[in-house]
Amino acid sequence: MSGVLIAVAALLALAAVFGAVLGFASEKFKVEGDPIVDQIDSLLPQTQCGQCGHPGCRPYAEAIAEGEEHNRCPPGGQDTVVALSELLGREELTLDDEGAEDANVAKVAYIREDECIGCTKCIQACPVDAIVGAAKLMHTVIVDECTGCDLCVEPCPVDCIDMLEVKPTLQTWGWQRPAGIGERPDSRIEVVNL
């Protein structure tokens, strides 16, 4: 019995020593991140869609901090460009929507379920997990979660995914802003449902 207690005590002592060494090392060799990158990253929509030319929002935030243009995020829209301009103290640019069909039109993925073969490639491609389904079963899109990044369209082997325009509803409709208040004339005023 005493042999077991000695082994347990030795393991506890080793765990305490290694824990202390790791704790000390984590404080001593801590690498400070650039706080501006964190602030930029928090303003980006986190869709990880790659439409900006970077593999995700964090690499794009790092590129912006190093001087790259801050107007290449179609999912974020013009509001994100304005917020980034204010944060960085840079000139306000217009959204560079090259590569995006129409950044001002909200789109959502739609899977024609009768044609879906259940390969799960669209599920793997979706950066926000807006597609549900299982292998060899049909898939469907959770419309409220879909960001319209269209990353699911290309991997589909049977081409059963379409990007459809989101039609205004009573919940999403808004008045056009009057021209001259610092916004584009076609931007909408947010409607708050009480």
From Swiss-Prot:
InterPro entries in the cross-refs: 4Fe-4S_dom (IPR007202), 4Fe4S_Fe-S-bd (IPR017896), 4Fe4S_Fe_S_CS (IPR017900), Elect_transpt_cplx_RnfB/RsxB (IPR010207), RnfB/RsxB_Proteobac (IPR016463), RnfB_subfamily (IPR050294)
Subcellular location: Cell inner membrane
Entry keyword annotation includes Translocase: yes
Binding residues annotated for [4Fe-4S] cluster 1, in chain numbering: C49, C52, C57, C73
Domain of life assignment: Bacteria
Record-level Gene Ontology MF annotations: 4 iron, 4 sulfur cluster binding; electron transfer activity; metal ion binding
UniProt-listed GO biological process terms: electron transport chain
EC code: 7.-.-.-
Gene Ontology CC: one annotated term: plasma membrane
UniProt feature coiled coil, ranges: none
Enzyme's top EC category: translocase
Domain 4Fe-4S intervals: 32-90
Residues given in the record as [4Fe-4S] cluster 2 binding sites: C116, C119, C122, C156
Transmembrane segments: none
Pfam families given in the database record: Fer4_21, FeS
PROSITE patterns: 4FE4S, 4FE4S_FER_1, 4FE4S_FER_2
Keywords from the named record: 4Fe-4S, Cell inner membrane, Cell membrane, Electron transport, Iron, Iron-sulfur, Membrane, Metal-binding, Repeat, Translocase, Transport
Family: Belongs to the 4Fe4S bacterial-type ferredoxin family. RnfB subfamily.
PANTHER family: ION-TRANSLOCATING OXIDOREDUCTASE COMPLEX SUBUNIT B, OXIDOREDUCTASE
Subunit structure comment from the entry: The complex is composed of six subunits: RnfA, RnfB, RnfC, RnfD, RnfE and RnfG.
Protein's name according to its UniProt entry: Ion-translocating oxidoreductase complex subunit B
Originating species: Alcanivorax borkumensis (strain ATCC 700651 / DSM 11573 / NCIMB 13689 / SK2)
Gene name in the database record: rnfB
